């Protein structure tokens, strides 16, 4: 299989889903260090198990939200009415605070995981649970009555991941210099759009113009689709990095980085697919 070279540029835009995989980028920039003869080398099987662990922690986070919603949130006064991409939902201040804290924790833990790889067993677990909490909030509160969109997004994500893995293992898509150049160009373009939009929104004179553009259904769909394409391409990059780790017999400690990086991208893809479905159904509701 193709190997990803160790000079891939690391880019981060932590305030949105328009971002690269920070863990995989850091892992990819490390020098190849083969395991000592008496040291366990990284293996595909253990990387798969660890990836499944992080995804399972996402489910735990989803269940945590449902439990808190039943025992705590539902008893709060539902004073907030919020419009979100064609959906209008009512919720409590406490629910919003918990969702906001989970979002901040997700951002902080992914940054710590990127810069302190040894922390991944802990930070990766917390990140995955926070993502599950946020996903559950979206599915069971924001789009209440349309919960099937969560399952539909899951089914599509499974198909996407399976398809991309087949395209990679069969060599249809290879991680070449041209591939990385296209990927980085798309990523920097999305980050540029995100920063331009943020700056424009903060300036009172341009705020109405930026809001009208970003509020346009087709513009929003186009940006979401582009972000999803980038995420899928990063999935290919993740597969290549995992090959790089295993085939170079790097120490087993790198399995945590490789598995969390893969889980990170899979969750990214799921969230973008869910966002796309929410926008489409929200538009049809109008």
Predicted ranges, named:
Residues 1-286:
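A hydrophobic alpha-helical transmembrane-helix feature that marks the membrane cores
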């Amino acid at each position: 299989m193709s190997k990803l070279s160790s000079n891939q540029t690391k880019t981060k835009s932590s305030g949105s889903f328009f971002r690269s995989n920070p863990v995989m980028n850091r892992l990819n920039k490390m020098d190849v260090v083969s395991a000592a003869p008496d040291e366990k080398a990284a293996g595909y099987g253990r990387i798969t198990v660890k990836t499944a662990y992080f995804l399972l922690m996402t489910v735990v986070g989803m269940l945590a939200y449902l439990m808190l919603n039943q025992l705590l949130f539902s008893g709060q006064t539902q004073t907030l009415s919020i419009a979100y991409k064609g959906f209008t939902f009512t919720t409590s201040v406490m629910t919003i605070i918990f969702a906001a804290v989970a979002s901040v924790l997700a951002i902080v833990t992914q940054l710590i995981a990127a810069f302190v790889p040894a922390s991944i067993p802990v930070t990766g677990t917390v990140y995955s649970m926070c993502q599950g909490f946020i996903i559950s909030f979206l599915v069971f509160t924001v789009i209440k009555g349309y919960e099937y969109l969560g399952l539909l997004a899951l089914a599509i994500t499974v198909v996407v991941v399976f398809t991309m893995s087949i395209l990679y293992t069969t060599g249809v898509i290879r991680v070449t210099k041209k591939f990385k150049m296209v990927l980085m160009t798309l990523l920097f373009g999305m980050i540029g759009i995100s920063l331009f939009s943020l700056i424009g929104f903060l300036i009172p004179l341009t705020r109405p113009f930026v809001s009208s553009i970003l509020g346009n259904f087709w513009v929003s769909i186009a940006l979401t689709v582009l972000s999803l394409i980038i995420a899928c391409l990063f999935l290919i990059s993740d597969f290549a990095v995992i090959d790089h780790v295993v085939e170079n017999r790097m120490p087993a400690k790198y399995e945590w980085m490789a598995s969390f990086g893969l889980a990170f991208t899979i969750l990214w893809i799921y969230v973008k697919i869910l966002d796309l479905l929410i926008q489409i159904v929200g538009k049809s509701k109008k």
